[in-house]
Design a protein with these regions (language model features):
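Hydrophobic alpha-helical segments of small multi-pass membrane proteins
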Residues: 55-59, 63, 83-87, 102-104, ...
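Short structured motifs
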Residues: 20-25, 82-88, 108-109
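Alpha-helical membrane-targeting segments
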Residues: 1-20, 44, 48
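Short connector loops at helix/strand junctions that flank enzyme active sites
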Residues: 18-20, 32, 52, 60, ...
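HotDog/MaoC-like acyl-thioester-processing domains
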Residues: 93, 103-120
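Catalytic strand-loop segment that frames the active site of acyl-thioester-processing enzymes
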Residues: 20-51
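Hydrophobic beta-strand-centered segment that forms part of the acyl-chain substrate-binding groove
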Residues: 68-105
């Protein structure tokens, strides 16, 4: 069975780390260039000052660039997510939304640089 963007969004929303952090994948685009993810700040996902817990926000953002790139490059390539960085601009309250975009041109650039097995 081929994974579709809709199936992956549902599966990722039900995945235990996301589910219990109030994280819902709203959608993956049909061409795997975009994803939208939401986190509902509630009693389980907030910190002592009633804003979004940083660990939950990190979980909300961690796998999506990797997944978009992996689906664009295909099975002939191995994609590893080796580090992440978050700048907390302001306290998160209510529903937090993250948008992820990996343009086709960027995926093609990575494919060309990795041609022949080179690390990118």
């Amino acid at each position: 069975m081929r994974i579709t963007p809709r199936r992956l969004a549902i599966g990722m929303s039900l995945w235990i780390p996301n589910f219990f952090n109030g994280i819902r994948v709203k959608r993956f685009s049909a061409d795997w260039t975009h994803a939208t993810v939401e986190m509902h700040v509630n009693v389980f996902t907030r910190n002592s000052v009633k804003t979004g817990f940083g660990g939950s926000m990190s979980a909300m953002t961690d796998p999506y660039f990797f997944m978009l790139l992996m689906h664009q490059l295909g099975r002939d390539y191995v994609v590893w997510d080796t580090r992440g960085e978050i700048e907390f601009v302001k306290p998160g309250r209510g529903v937090l939304t993250a948008e992820f975009t990996v343009p086709r041109a960027k995926a093609e650039e990575i494919r060309e640089r990795a041609h022949g097995g080179a690390k990118v």
